[in-house]
Amino acid sequence: MGFLEKQYGVHYAMGGVQAMADAMARIVRAQGGEIRLGTDVDRIEIEGGAARGVTLGTGQRLAAPLVVSNADPGHTYRHLMRAAPRKRWRDKRLKGRRWSMGLFVWYFGTKGTREMWPDVGHHTILSGPRYAPLLKDVFLKGHLADDMSLYIHRPSVTDPSVAPEGDDTFYALSPVPHLGHADPVDWSTMQHRYRDLVAGELERLMPGFRDRITTELTFTPETFRDRYLSPYGSGFSLEPRILQSAWFRPHNVSEEARGLYLVGAGTHPGAGVPGVISSAEVLGQLVPDAPARAAQGLAAE
């Protein structure tokens, strides 16, 4: 990926990730699909070794000839398929996997700053004083250190539509331990303190930015766990080690049930927007087309 970014540059979808999601939603609806927002799936129904639909948190059952899960494979197998026998992705195997780091993400908007800090572009990496020791704290020890390395995203320098005229949109991302360590970070007590530490680092890069903040929102590993059902609040699903990458990740065609397919960061080929979109393209080649009768019905409508 490093070579591709250096050789061909970094692509940005105007309007941001929301524009991509909106475009996908339009395609689904144009094909007669329905999107139910704010709806939890409690389990995937498995009958005779095949996926036959889902049961929602309300108890409603939706029958289907096949099921595609874009939940993290850890959640799909440990929770959504908790009542079904599994041969490969049992709870013990999933618990023994190495999960990626957690993320502390601070989103904020600033007023009247578009012409300020000209050295801060769309993408900025701010390296901390330590490298290998910080990685050990994050990945091995589960220790939340006071020092950090940050990625700063300022999309408004490329896409003015993401902020009011003259203003800016930012997020600052810091790698932090996930919640699966022996003594996980209690973010209910640490969130505001860590936000202040991040602000102190950013102040060196963008003097005076704190006085211009108009809105803000913070995500912690607890947010990723509760909002996105990510195991241990990990930011990128399974850690992309050699034996947890590409083909060694849970397969797009589930090994546990016929008619069950996986898509997203935790499956092949991996995490990140390019990886997730690629997994959808892979699935487009693997999932059978809708039966002709259903297609004719949609055309008639």
Residue ranges and their predicted role:
Residues 13, 42-164:
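Mid-domain catalytic core of redox enzymes
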Residues 1-57:
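Helical element adjacent to the flavin cofactor pocket in flavoenzyme catalytic cores
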Residues 34, 38, 208-217, 294, ...:
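Flexible, glycine/charged-enriched surface loops at secondary-structure junctions
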Residues 112-224:
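C-terminal segments that line or cap access tunnels to active or ligand-binding sites in enzymes
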Residues 43-46, 219, 288-301:
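Active-site-proximal substrate-binding core of FAD-dependent oxidoreductases
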Residues 265-288:
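A conserved FAD-binding loop/helix module that cradles the flavin
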Residues 68, 108, 172, 202, ...:
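Hydrophobic, well-ordered secondary-structure elements that form the walls
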